[in-house]
Amino acid sequence: MSYKLLIINPGSTSTKIGVYENEKELFEETLRHTNEEIKRYETIYDQFQFRKDVILNILKEKNFDITTLSAIVGRGGMLKPVEGGTYAVNDAMIEDLKVGVQGPHASNLGGIIAKSIGDELNIPSFIVDPVVTDELDDVARLSGVPELPRKSKFHALNQKAVAKRYGKDSGKGYENLNLIVVHMGGGVSVGAHKQGKVVDVNNALDGDGPFSPERAGTVPVGDLIKMCFSGQYTESEVYTKVVGKGGFVGYLNTNDVKGVIDNMEAGDKDCEKIYKAFLYQITKTIGEMAAALNGKVDQILLTGGIAYSPTLVPDLKSNVEWIAPVTVYPGEDELLALAQGAIRVLDGEEKAKIY
């Protein structure tokens, strides 16, 4: 069957849209929003009509007939924790997206805009593998402090997309494999995928795991507590040290990993030190996830923007190939991953889940 899909991926200052015919991209646009435009709205939900109009206007400009669409797919937002998969957007989901039950985030608008356009056209609307995807084993939820359970916050959409792609490419099927998926971008998430479920993963936003271009990962917690009560920092300043100004930004004042590697190869010792620590921490976390899978690992998958690195990828491979063979799927194509999630449902390969 042939399907035409409109894909909507809202970010804080832009909305990315794509129109796909099955897995073929017909066109893609990044609609940028100025600070002035965004500032007009008090809450993220208040931006709904503005962003929807911008999307419909660009489709009109391109003379695209929206009545030819089969479904609308939005980026999944900060809902209650759910298991991975493709979800039909329903009223319960819309209510939770409006308030952002796990926090305000532009991606909350994805499902809201998708349902609004879908309902007008009388076609289904979906979200796919939202960032709150949570399939953790119960043992992985305990942190050691009862009030602070471990949370599943990771690059669920891309991790699931490459894991399913490898399942197809290998002919074995995602549900029959044990995989370790390593997403390396602005944050780094390392997930243990056990027969179709992410049973353990580091909280790549503000929890634990390797440091990344902009995030701190696991830090010495006693010292962090002292920092919080030193009187020198506000709460948001400490948070920014962990998310935004951690990792490469903290040490080298840049989030450009490629530039750091170039400098290292030109003899910069500071860059070499940070690069080696970065490589070491990712290696160690892969080892941790191999242990979570009891050493039964079929394949390690590397993905995200940093997986394009001609230096880091061979270095990482040589560190972890003793665990399992390594396959590289560089970059991240969120629009395609969202399209594929909808196609699996429209084709009857998967059932749409109900929120």
UniProtKB/Swiss-Prot annotation:
Gene3D superfamilies: 3.30.420.40. One of its GO terms (biological process) is acetate metabolic process. Its EC number is 2.7.2.7. GO terms for cellular component: cytoplasm. CDD domains: ASKHA_NBD_BK. Its main location: cytoplasm. GO terms for molecular function: acetate kinase activity; ATP binding; butyrate kinase activity. It is found in: Cytoplasm. It holds the Pfam family Acetate_kinase. InterPro entries: Aliphatic_acid_kin_short-chain, Aliphatic_acid_kinase_CS, ATPase_NBD, Butyrate_kin. The keyword Ion transport does not apply. The keyword Cell wall biogenesis/degradation does not apply. Belongs to the acetokinase family. This is Probable butyrate kinase. The gene is buk.
